[in-house]
Every structure is written in structure tokens, then in C-alpha cells.
Amino acid sequence: MSHPSTAPAHPSRLALYARLVRIDKPIGTLLLLWPTLWAMWMAAGGPPGWTLFWIFFAGTFLMRSAGCAMNDWADRDFDKHVKRTKERPLTAGLIASWEALAVAAVLALIALALILPLNALTKWLAVVAAVLAGTYPFFKRFFAIPQAYLGIAFGFGIPMAFAAIQDQVPFVAWLMLLANVFWAIAYDTAYAMVDRDDDLLLGMKTSAITFGRFDVAAIMICYAVFLGLMAWAGSLLGLGWPYYAGLVAAAGMAGYHYTLIRERDRMKCFAAFRHNNWLGACVFAGTFVAYLLK
């Protein structure tokens, strides 16, 4: 006796929206969160207080999620030609373009609402951060190294943290933001190496394409500059040996990444990108212990 075939269940709208904002892929949120946490501890001279911590934690998650939705909307005509992205909900036709924009707008508005109790400087910087997040996807069309712009967008929690805690953005905050730009170029170039062949066919601009055969060397130079600038920031703040131990551990992580990317294998390059979460964690651990013992 034959049984009637059962049609595969379609994912719910909520599940599709969760995929749109990469709920299942938290690496982007973590790469946004670590620099923000470094800055919060440095600005406060230790733990910043739970209220501020949760405001920035939630804001980071929401803005990264909004950025993912905005990115998919901006790249909807390109992603269908890239193996890694062609199954995304918007590209696959499972949700409409207006839905992606609506999700991005709602999440961004919630994130902006979170900072209403904070001072005016932080609010103005939040507006700048929102503009950076919303415009980044379009820089890949014409800017040779869009990863530098990404580094500014992903690191803007640094000046915001100093503004929220100190009501000013001192030199050390901008120094750390510059350091974050080099870190972002390093990890996102490894990420761009995964899609380089597809991006070349589509005429997209990425640092992996711009650096060409010097891509691995460029990544390692960016790691070195990042660590050097962070060491400078630590000296300006008078941080002790645990902070520098964290930077040494981060340097060890960068060395490990070299072993992954040197052959330019796609899967290993992607692994190096994901592993930057632990590099960021090393810097935070050093910062945390340095203030704990100060």
C-alpha cells in the first residue's frame, strides 16, 4: 500500500528572518563585540557597570543583525552567483526585498532606542555608526579595500564606549579604532580569499583581489600593525604585564592563522577568519586581568 507523499515543510517567517540576520553564525557579532569590550574596560578603568554593558552588548547584536539584512538587500543581485551565498533567504526568493529592509530598519531603531538614556555625544556617534553600517555594502562596488571601511564600522563601538563613559573621545580611542581597521583588513581579507574567484567574475572589489599575490603578506603586516597600535594604546593607559601577555597570545594566534592561509585553501582561509574570535578574546582577557590587578 502506497502512502501519500508529504511535501517538505516550509520554514516559518521567523526562521527565515533568523537566517537573514545570521542568528546561526555569531562570528560577526563577536568581531564587533570584542573591540567594544576592550574600549569599555579601558574607558572605565575596569568593569563599566552592568547597565552600560548590556546596552552595548544588545546594541552590538542588533546592529550586526541589521547590517546583515542590509547587506543581503544590497547584494541580492550578486549573491545568486556566489556559491556560498546563493541559498540565503532573500537571494533564494524565500523573502521579499522589502522584508529585508523592514527587518534592518526595525533592528536599527531598537538599537538606537537603547542608547536614549546615554549622553548626547554617544547618540550622535550612534547615528554615525548606523550610517556606516548601512553604507558598507555599497563600498564593495568601487572601493579597492572595502575591508578598511568595514573596520571603521565594526570598530565604532570604541569611540561610542568612551563617549558613554567619559563624555569625550580621547586620542587613545581613535588610536584603537585605527588598530581595529588593520585587524578588520587582516581577518576580512582571509574571508574574501574564500570568494575571490566569484568576486572577480562579478567585478566586486575586495582586499583579497587588490592585494593579489601579496594577500598573505598583507594580512600578516596588518596583524603586526594592529598589535603594535594596541600596545601603544596600552602604554598610554598605563596597563600592566597581563595586557601585554594578552597581546603576545594574540600574536601567537596570528601566527597560527598564517599556517592556515599560506596555501590559500578556501576552507582553511575561512577557518582563519572564524578563529579571529579567539584573537579578540585574548586581547580582552589581557585587558580584564590588567585592570583586575591594577
Curated annotation (Swiss-Prot):
It is found in: Cell inner membrane. Keywords: Cell inner membrane, Cell membrane, Magnesium, Membrane, Transferase, Transmembrane, Transmembrane helix, Ubiquinone biosynthesis. PROSITE patterns: UBIA (PS00943). The chain crosses the membrane at residues 37-57, 101-121, 142-162, 169-189, 219-239, 241-261, 271-293. Its EC number is 2.5.1.39. GO terms for cellular component: plasma membrane. It is an enzyme of class 2 (transferase). Its cofactor is Mg(2+). Pathway: Cofactor biosynthesis; ubiquinone biosynthesis. It catalyses: all-trans-octaprenyl diphosphate + 4-hydroxybenzoate = 4-hydroxy-3-(all-trans-octaprenyl)benzoate + diphosphate. Its main location: membrane. It is a multi-pass membrane protein. One of its GO terms (molecular function) is 4-hydroxybenzoate polyprenyltransferase activity. GO terms for biological process: ubiquinone biosynthetic process. InterPro entries: HB_polyprenyltransferase-like, Prenyltransferase, UbiA_prenyltransferase, UbiA_prenylTrfase_CS, UbiA_sf. HAMAP family: UbiA (MF_01635). Belongs to the UbiA prenyltransferase family. Catalyzes the prenylation of para-hydroxybenzoate (PHB) with an all-trans polyprenyl group. Mediates the second step in the final reaction sequence of ubiquinone-8 (UQ-8) biosynthesis, which is the condensation of the polyisoprenoid side chain with PHB, generating the first membrane-bound Q intermediate 3-octaprenyl-4-hydroxybenzoate. This is 4-hydroxybenzoate octaprenyltransferase. It comes from Cupriavidus metallidurans (strain ATCC 43123 / DSM 2839 / NBRC 102507 / CH34) (Ralstonia metallidurans). The lineage of its organism: Bacteria, Pseudomonadati, Pseudomonadota, Betaproteobacteria, Burkholderiales. The gene is ubiA.
